[in-house]
Amino acid sequence: MVSYDLSPEQDMVPYAHKDGDVWAPKRKNHIRKLNNAYWLSHSLFHSGAELVHGTVYDIPASVGLVDISTLGSILLHVRDPLSALEQAARITKETIIVTDILDNNRQKMVNRLAGWLGDAVVRRIRHKLLGPSVIFRPDAAVGHPEETWWHLTPELIERFLAVVGFGDSRISYHNQFFAQHNKSQLMYTIVATRTVPMKRAVL
């Protein structure tokens, strides 16, 4: 098992009116705290997982091939999420699991109004009304958010996963408590299975 984590120099939104030399160290300190939490859990649960730091745009060959890759609320935080997903697909033999925030109000409304009909119906309604789409989140007028680039709909991720060889997928939804803002956040999870054999060059 390998835990692949962003280095402290992750993709921050380069607002021209903000001094990166001031807020970048604060962000690095925040990342260090997250890393400390990882090591605490690693110790308490006697985990044998190896932690590797790096960029999601160039996962090193030393990581090797894996059966399953999970990306938990990471794609919204990188400048080029599709390249990141492509890198994960390159080393994954069987299944990719993507969990992310469903933070577009139109999408939340569809889930609230039609959720009782079941995931399959919600999926058809969402695809008909919204389709695969992406929203650019940074707003120069307010200088926020500093570390979130995109809202990526599950339909977009599903289609791209099919492009990189994971054509059998299912989408589910759940609510997760977000302690920082003391509220429940609607999330989606895509479980996609490889349908196109890995290229020999990768093996």
Regions found by a protein language model. Give the residues of each.
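Conserved SAM-binding loop
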Residues: 1-17, 21-107, 154-158, 192-194
